[in-house]
């Protein structure tokens, strides 16, 4: 378990602390209070984790002893890292692979690195923002490299050992002004590769095998950075191995794992930005009326946090049901143009004030159970409190999720009926897990620590008391049958 500058190993049955790793950080990082890490990785006898100061470390799983410590990036004058590594690593074929995010004031955009799992040495680096003169480099409206930002990778990737591919999602650009300018010259597009894309990389070399850009020229902060689920679904009566992902708009795209070819899309109906999706290519056509205009505020659904965000979905491979945590929101969206010099200095130029949907009824939290193979919705649960945790689905037909009102709840996977809930000290804004010890089944979730989902939804439900609280691990034992 990670919290700020510390990592703890606990006895899963008793909660006893087995070891703790504490990292010394520059004063500017406030002991890692602002850091967010979504996962750790274990490979062999080593545990791998990013740190708030831009390093990746390997620890012995049994003792917490440092095996190696590698600086992925150089700190600034105040000791802060120019990028974050909030997604956590994935390990494939002896490579620890992790992406960077933010870098809102760092031109050139983000990247994904592959480190040797034994030594920590960097093996390769892939830039998620295409450079001029390289493949995709002509998709930035002719902007020089120092005016290209974003492409953050702030969730972990997935690995397919059969195809030897790792899949990552990317975010948007941080300054839309580059893409709003008139086309500078023939042959230059404004697609902004490789933002809002699924990337398939060779883990040995970091070479791009294929990419699929879900939203070209994203000027609305619609990140497609979330989990890349490796699923097998019937397509035209034949079991087909797919990679499935969904963006902030709660549109899900299914692609062939080997080629990236579009297979199908599912729109859950909580957005007003995309008016149509090409069934052959998956290209999403945005509503031209929502094009940013200086001095004009426009209604955008969802808000910048999205109808969905980093909280992961859960999938039942037997029934093909995907369980999706959602928040029903909109935003008043505006754009302030900036000069090329201001763009090169960093920062962002779009703004959004969260607001309820015009057709809303005061309920913002939503769980949707959808058959991915057919598109049929099995059930929907709606409630006032926005959801702030990943979903956990179990073989015992339970679905667990946490909400802003501090409740951690279990629902029947087949019907959506509420079966159990308990209120914690703070919002359970993490990814719950389940495990067994000596035949006993447990469910664990972390609460507290704040985060953008908790703060970004707070204005919708001002009556909900959600104290920041200290980070707390809660563990529940499931009753024996």
Model-derived regions: residue spans:
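Repeat-blade elements of multi-bladed beta-propeller folds
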Residues: 1-6, 31-56, 81-105, 109, ...
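Beta-propeller domains
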Residues: 2-24, 204-206
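Beta-strand initiation motifs
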Residues: 14-19, 63-68, 119-123, 205-209, ...
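Extracytoplasmic beta-rich repeat domains
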Residues: 20-41, 66-88, 127-156, 173-175, ...
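Beta-propeller blade signature
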Residues: 59-64, 109-122, 186-206, 255-260, ...
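Structural motif
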Residues: 107-111, 177-178, 195, 251-253, ...
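Phosphate/diphosphate-binding loops
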Residues: 229-278, 292-303, 308, 413, ...
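Blade-level signature of beta-propeller repeat domains, shared across WD40, Kelch, NHL, RCC1
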Residues: 432-481
């Amino acid at each position: 378990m990670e919290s700020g500058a510390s990592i703890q190993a606990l006895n899963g049955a008793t909660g006893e602390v087995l070891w703790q790793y504490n990292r010394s950080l520059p004063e500017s990082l406030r002991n890692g209070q602002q850091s967010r890490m979504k996962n750790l990785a274990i490979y062999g006898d080593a545990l791998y984790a990013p740190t708030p100061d831009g390093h990746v470390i390997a620890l012995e799983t049994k003792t917490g002893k440092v095996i190696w410590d590698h600086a992925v990036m150089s700190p600034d004058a105040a000791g802060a890292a120019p990028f974050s590594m909030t997604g956590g690593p994935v390990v494939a074929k002896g490579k620890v692979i992790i992406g960077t995010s933010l870098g809102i004031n760092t031109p050139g955009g983000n990247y994904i690195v592959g480190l040797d799992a034994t030594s920590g040495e960097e093996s390769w680096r892939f830039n998620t923002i295409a450079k001029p003169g390289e493949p995709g480099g002509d998709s930035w409206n002719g902007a020089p490299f120092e005016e290209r930002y974003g492409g953050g990778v702030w969730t972990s990737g997935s690995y397919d050992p059969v195809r030897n591919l790792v899949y990552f999602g990317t975010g948007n650009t941080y300054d839309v002004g580059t893409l709003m300018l008139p086309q500078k010259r023939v042959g230059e597009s404004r697609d902004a590769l490789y933002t809002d894309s699924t990337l398939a990389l060779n883990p040995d070399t970091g070479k791009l095998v294929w990419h699929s850009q879900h939203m070209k020229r994203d000027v609305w902060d619609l990140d497609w950075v979330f989990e890349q689920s490796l699923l097998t679904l019937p397509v035209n009566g034949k079991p087909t191995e797919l990679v499935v992902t969904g963006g902030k708009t709660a549109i899900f795209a299914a692609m062939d794992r080997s080629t990236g070819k579009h297979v199908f899309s599912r729109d859950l109906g909580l957005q007003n930005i995309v008016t149509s999706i090409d069934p052959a290519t998956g290209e999403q056509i945005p509503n031209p009326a929502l094009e940013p205009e200086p001095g004009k505020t426009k209604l955008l659904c969802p808000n910048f946090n999205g109808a969905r965000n980093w909280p992961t979905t859960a999938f039942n491979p037997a029934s093909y049901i995907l369980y999706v945590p959602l928040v029903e929101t909109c935003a008043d969206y505006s754009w302030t143009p900036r000069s090329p010099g201001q763009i090169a200095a960093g920062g962002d130029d779009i703004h959004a004030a969260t607001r309820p949907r015009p057709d809303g009824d005061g309920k913002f939290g939503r769980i949707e159970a959808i058959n991915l193979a057919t598109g049929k919705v099995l059930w929907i649960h709606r409630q006032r409190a926005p959801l702030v945790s990943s979903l956990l689905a179990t073989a015992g037909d339970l679905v667990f999720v946490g909400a802003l009102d501090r409740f951690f709840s279990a629902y029947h996977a087949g019907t959506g009926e509420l079966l159990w809930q308990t209120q914690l000290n703070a919002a359970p804004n993490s990814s719950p897990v389940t495990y067994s010890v000596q035949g006993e089944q447990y469910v664990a979730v972390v609460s507290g620590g704040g985060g953008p989902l908790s703060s970004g939804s707070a204005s919708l439900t001002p009556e909900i008391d959600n104290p920041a609280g200290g980070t707390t691990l809660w563990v529940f034992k499931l009753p024996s049958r």
